[in-house]
Amino acid sequence: MLKFMLDTNICIFTIKNKPASVRERFNLNQGKMCISSVTLMELIYGAEKSQMPERNLAVIEGFVSRIDVLDYDAAAATHTGQIRAELARQGRPVGPFDQMIAGHARSRGLIIVTNNTREFERVGGLRTEDWS
């Protein structure tokens, strides 16, 4: 049963094995984690613009083979629209991709795992954990 949705930075920490505590938590929670297709897009973008795109894309492919990737769907879009409006009213916006990942996690009732808790904690009804 899925419990956690990993943010992009936690995926990168896991891939690089730094800090080691993130990899340990990743290994302990096999079968309970997923990423959003939005996170996959961010990982691919980072690899494509890197100095070694082929190598980095292969690493991402290996990582993604060990975790569920959830498609961004209508429920996620609905939650994202609500989050964007709530944060705009408060004058406390977050980045568009973080809004989408937050909306996706909230729509599925998942805990977002991130080291960027300051951004995600602004989102009502979203639970966060920092494994770093």
UniProtKB/Swiss-Prot annotation:
Q: Which CDD domains match?
A: PIN_VapC4-5_FitB-like
Q: Does the keyword Magnesium apply?
A: yes
Q: What is this protein called?
A: tRNA(fMet)-specific endonuclease VapC
- PANTHER family from the entry? RIBONUCLEASE VAPC2
Induction behaviour: Degradation of tRNA(fMet) is induced by chloramphenicol treatment, suggesting the antitoxin is unstable.
Enumerate the spans annotated as PINc domain.
5-131
Against InterPro entries, the record matches this protein to: PIN-like_dom_sf, PIN_dom, Type_II_TA_system_RNase, VapC_family
Q: Which prosthetic group or cofactor does it need?
A: Mg(2+)
Q: Does the keyword Magnesium apply?
A: yes
Q: Name one GO molecular function term.
A: magnesium ion binding
